[in-house]
């Protein structure tokens, strides 16, 4: 084309949304009259390209040609003007920032002045694919007044935090239970966090998940007992791995002893398998032998130092500047303390040197002998200065100790040395006491729990950063040459509970503003063990109209012996016994053998016996030889009641 063959013109294609604008930039030294309008070739090429890209957009051609005409009169100027681009470019949708995480710092791990997390760090160690592991996180209010807070769940799809019945205002001393679940998809290291937004300080609870071998159940002490010389005794212990990942182990002899040996000293624990380690003892002498061994199992190591970039994490310049200034202030304070200590030691040395210094001169004798230049150096080493005897003194006089001018410098040096040692001992004791008090405060805060203390000390990477920690693995922001590693705790069954995967519809999210509606409907379902009542056969009449068998069941009335009623007892006051005046109501004899039927409930032990009820009547006394009418009136049981004369 003529447009492409002209070396003084360049064609720029600017694609904006759905339109293609042909921009022509004139770069030449032609006069303004010659550069006033583009040629027909340029306008034809622009129209052809525009029509090919958008055939139905011919209505906007005049606007484009006017734009090309106006912009072509300016050298080195892009055609797409601001008004035209604003009309064509689609506005980006606005995103509402989360006020709980935007420009918020979550750096306090474990506890703050208001809230305390139990445990401070959640570890899911030694997991299996396809299972869901859950732990309970308790957030306690340790302040004297109530508080409100927001719980921000983990951001990765592998962790889930639910709180079905969250309290609005948490009273002092009360706890909020949060169920944290973890569902892995592969064997690797997972990291996330649960963030708690509170009034003054925000709380961070890290979540770690990693494949690791089980906690070694090696005993802390193995006693072989009394063993004869030359005899070998073996003790076997097991290293187990519940996850399908192999782990290397090595047993190191911290305090070796030739009487002990461990086989195998190193090896691999297979996935979902176990390895037996034998410890042999063969005494070589009649003494108590002792050895110390240490078992090291290769696990997952996490970085101890993190390098965060502002672009990926979203660090604020103010936070970075504040951290740098705080670090500089701490370094300056440490340097000032070192300079102060050095200055004190220098002043002390100068004072001691000034005390030993002697100015030699020709002053008149003041009753004490002047020292020479070599004598102060000897005094510093503890030498004894013995003054010379004065002129005219007799040798038979008292010793040097009786001379008032005599000063034993070795005693002074010894006392000064003891005093300095005592002062140093007192100062060291005070410092150790302060450190011990701080350690006791930390242990009391952790409840003297070894597991919590290990969790606090196992991951110092989470205790130093002041940034808003994202929900991604920290290894993403690391440089290998600037990282040192530290192992995580081993697998323990008591740390979490295992249950099968649950449908996602049963979860309740924290951002659900609507009232909670049950997703499960209720209906009566037969158990399958007992058939319904409609399937049973009809009940016979013998079961519908059964006599009351409530007082006695047995063969008391089954034999031919006659039982006489108990004699009445009279009180000293001449009244009749009330218990003798009543008797139970007696029914006719019910013979179950005669009316036996299916499901009638008949009992053969009641054959020939009367059916007794729980109702009572007034006793009717019969004569010694009753008649048939009297017998029928008494009940027809054959029991004779007599009254003594």
From Swiss-Prot:
Cellular-component GO terms for this entry: axonemal central apparatus; axoneme
Broad class of the protein's primary localization: cytoplasm
> GO:BP terms for this protein?
cilium assembly; cilium movement
Any single Pfam family the record assigns to this protein: PapD-like
**One of the record's GO molecular function terms:** calmodulin binding
- Region Disordered, as annotated, extends over 381-408
**What is the annotated localization of this protein?**
Cytoplasm, Cytoskeleton, Cilium axoneme; Cytoplasm
Q: Subunit info? A: Interacts with calmodulin; calcium-dependent. Part of the PDCP1 complex composed of CFAP46, CFAP54, CFAP74 and CFAP221; the PDCP1 complex binds calmodulin.
| PANTHER family the UniProt entry points to | CILIA- AND FLAGELLA-ASSOCIATED PROTEIN 221 (PTHR46500:SF1)
Name the chain's protein.
Answer: Cilia- and flagella-associated protein 221 homolog
Species name: Chlamydomonas reinhardtii
Q: Tell me what gene encodes this.
A: CFAP221
């Amino acid at each position: 084309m003529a447009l492409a063959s002209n070396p003084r013109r360049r064609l720029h294609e600017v694609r904006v949304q759905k339109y293609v604008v042909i921009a022509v930039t004139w770069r030449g030294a032609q006069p303004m009259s010659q550069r006033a309008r583009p040629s027909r070739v340029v306008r034809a090429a622009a129209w052809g390209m525009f029509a090919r890209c958008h055939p139905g957009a011919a209505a906007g051609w005049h606007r484009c040609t006017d734009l090309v005409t106006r912009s072509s009169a300016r050298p080195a100027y892009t055609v797409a003007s601001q008004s035209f681009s604003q009309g064509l470019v689609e506005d980006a949708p606005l995103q509402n920032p989360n006020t709980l995480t935007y420009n918020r710092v979550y750096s306090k791990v474990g506890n703050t002045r208001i809230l305390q997390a139990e445990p401070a760090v959640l570890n899911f160690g030694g997991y299996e694919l396809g299972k869901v592991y859950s732990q309970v996180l308790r957030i306690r209010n340790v302040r004297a007044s109530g508080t409100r807070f927001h719980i921000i769940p983990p951001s990765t799809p592998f962790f889930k935090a639910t709180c079905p019945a969250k309290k609005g205002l948490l009273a002092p001393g009360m706890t909020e239970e949060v169920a944290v679940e973890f569902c892995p998809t592969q064997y690797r290291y997972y990291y996330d966090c649960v963030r708690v937004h509170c009034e003054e300080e925000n709380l961070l609870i890290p979540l770690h998940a990693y494949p690791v071998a089980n906690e070694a159940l090696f005993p802390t002490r193995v006693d072989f007992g009394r063993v004869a010389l030359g005899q070998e005794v073996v003790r076997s212990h097991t290293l187990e791995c519940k996850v399908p990942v192999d782990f290397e182990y090595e047993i190191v002899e911290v305090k070796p002893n030739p009487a002990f040996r461990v086989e195998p000293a190193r090896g691999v624990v297979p996935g979902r398998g176990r390895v037996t380690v034998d410890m042999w003892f063969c005494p070589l002498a009649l003494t108590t032998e002792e050895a110390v061994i240490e078992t090291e199992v290769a696990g997952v190591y996490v970085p101890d130092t993190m390098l965060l970039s502002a672009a990926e994490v979203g660090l604020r310049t103010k936070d970075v500047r504040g951290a740098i200034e705080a670090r500089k202030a701490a370094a300056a304070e440490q340097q000032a303390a070192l300079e102060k200590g050095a200055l004190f030691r220098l002043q002390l040395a100068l004072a001691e040197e000034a005390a030993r210094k002697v100015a030699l001169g020709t002053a008149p004798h003041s009753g004490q002998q002047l020292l020479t230049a070599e004598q102060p150096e000897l005094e510093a080493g503890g030498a004894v200065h013995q003054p010379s005897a004065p002129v005219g003194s007799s040798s038979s006089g008292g010793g040097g100790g009786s001379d008032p001018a005599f000063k034993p410098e070795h005693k002074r040096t010894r006392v000064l040395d003891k005093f300095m040692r005592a002062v140093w001992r007192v100062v060291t004791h005070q410092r150790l006491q302060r450190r011990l008090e701080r350690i006791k405060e930390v242990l009391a805060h952790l409840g003297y729990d070894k597991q919590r203390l290990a969790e606090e000390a196992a991951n110092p990477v989470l205790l130093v950063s002041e940034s808003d920690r994202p929900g991604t693995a920290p290894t993403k922001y690391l440089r290998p040459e600037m990282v040192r590693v530290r192992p995580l705790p081993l697998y323990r069954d008591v740390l979490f509970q295992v249950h099968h995967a649950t449908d996602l519809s049963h979860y309740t999210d924290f951002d659900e503003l609507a009232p909670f509606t049950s997703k499960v409907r209720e209906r009566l379902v037969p158990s399958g063990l007992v058939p319904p009542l409609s399937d049973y056969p009809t009940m016979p009449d013998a079961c519908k109209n059964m006599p009351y068998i409530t007082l006695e069941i047995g063969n008391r009335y089954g034999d031919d012996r006659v039982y006489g009623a108990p004699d009445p007892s009279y009180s000293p006051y001449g009244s009749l016994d009330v218990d003798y005046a009543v008797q139970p109501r007696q029914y006719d004899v019910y013979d179950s053998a005669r009316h036996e039927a299916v499901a009638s409930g008949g009992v053969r032990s009641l054959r020939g016996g009367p059916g007794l009820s729980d109702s009572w009547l007034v006793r009717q006394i019969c004569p010694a030889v009753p008649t048939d009418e009297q017998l029928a009136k008494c009940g027809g049981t054959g029991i004779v009641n007599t009254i003594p004369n």
